[in-house]
Amino acid sequence: MKSVITTVVGAADSASRFPSASDMESVQGSIQRAAARLEAAEKLSANYDAIAQRAVDAVYAQYPNGATGRQPRQCATEGKEKCKRDFVHYLRLINYCLVTGGTGPLDELAINGQKEVYKALSIDAGTYVAGFSNMRNDGCSPRDMSAQALTAYNTLLDYVINSLG
């Protein structure tokens, strides 16, 4: 999985050079933000099930059939379970990104090819956007986590939302 550190080192190595001053500044910034990212990862690990369930509830409140594609889900219970499973999967990848300090886990294990998969399954990505937007708007500092941790978490949610758009 890629992180800022592995990306910087890999780029320098590919160019047969030592990391530059700007490379080192990038790594230093990542290290300085690490405490906030790890706080967000810890809070997410402890609350992922409730976060995913609130997202599912928001999706089904906005889209009663659970999908806005061509084929509404046949069984609301099964659809909700699958929707929650998908949100939990994304939250786990977001957690990995918070730990590594990069978007590699999301890029490699979720974002690449997601639009094609959703289209093939007749699932409108808008349902996921609604759920991720709910997650983003539901987070509160200092109730849930510090402002810096919430920013790190929300940045990754925005990354996912934008990839679906």
Swiss-Prot record:
Could you name the domain of life of the organism this protein comes from?
Answer: Bacteria
The subcellular location is:
Cellular thylakoid membrane
The membrane topology noted for this protein in its Swiss-Prot or TrEMBL record is: Peripheral membrane protein
Indicate which residues the UniProt annotation says bind (2R,3E)-phycoerythrobilin 1: 83
List the Pfam families hit by this protein, alphabetically.
Phycobilisome
Give yes or no: UniProt keyword Amino-acid biosynthesis.
no
Q: Which residues are involved in binding phycourobilin?
A: 75
User: Under the cellular component aspect of Gene Ontology, which terms does the record hold?
Assistant: phycobilisome; plasma membrane-derived thylakoid membrane
Question: Can you cite a GO biological process for this protein?
Answer: photosynthesis
Kindly provide the PTM information from the record.
Answer: Contains two covalently linked phycoerythrobilin chromophores and one covalently linked phycourobilin chromophore.
Q: Which residues bind (2R,3E)-phycoerythrobilin 2?
A: 140
Q: Which UniProt keywords apply?
A: Antenna complex, Bile pigment, Chromophore, Electron transport, Membrane, Photosynthesis, Phycobilisome, Thylakoid, Transport
Subunit details for this protein?
Heterodimer of an alpha and a beta chain.
Q: Member of which family?
A: Belongs to the phycobiliprotein family.
The record ties this protein, via PANTHER family, to: C-PHYCOCYANIN ALPHA SUBUNIT (PTHR34011:SF4), PHYCOBILISOME 32.1 KDA LINKER POLYPEPTIDE, PHYCOCYANIN-ASSOCIATED, ROD 2-RELATED (PTHR34011)
This chain's function reads: Light-harvesting photosynthetic bile pigment-protein from the phycobiliprotein complex.
The name on file for this protein is C-phycoerythrin class 2 subunit alpha
